[in-house]
Amino acid sequence: MKNLKLLPLFLLICALSFACCETDKQPQKVLRHVVLFGFDSTVTANQVKEIEEAFQALPQQIEEIKGYEWGTDCSPEGLQKGLTHCFLVTFHSEKDRDAYLIHPAHQAFGKLINGKLSAITVVDYWTK
């Protein structure tokens, strides 16, 4: 019987615990680094693949990268202006992004793409 009297208290504690956990799940602002590439017409499919794989390897080499995804253009609008590849890199701070920019792995990647792009656009933004 004593346990039954404690049941409402237990349920209240559980409800409050879940409510606290839910507030922790609110999305925090993150810094997105969007990189768009268009490849020079002389670049081979193997070279494009090498660049894709090299970019994919950066999150394993640079701990400041908190998220990464990429894909190729599939828009029917015809507004790509030669850009074919989009890479999205996520950081928790500008300090993390700045560390990524000067990291030796990123610098080596820059050398790999040198002379192989016909277009490049980079945009950074804070999520809202």
What are these regions (language model features)?
Residues 6-7, 18-84, 92-99, 125-128:
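Short S/T/G/P-rich N-terminal loop/turn motif that feeds into the first structured element of a domain
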Residues 1-17:
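Sec-dependent bacterial lipoprotein signal peptides
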Residues 10, 37-38, 102, 111:
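Intrinsically disordered, low-complexity segments enriched in polar/charged small residues
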Residues 86-128:
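Surface-exposed, polar helix/loop patches in the mature regions of secreted/periplasmic/lumenal proteins
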Residues 11-14, 55, 72, 104, ...:
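Alpha-helix boundary/capping residues
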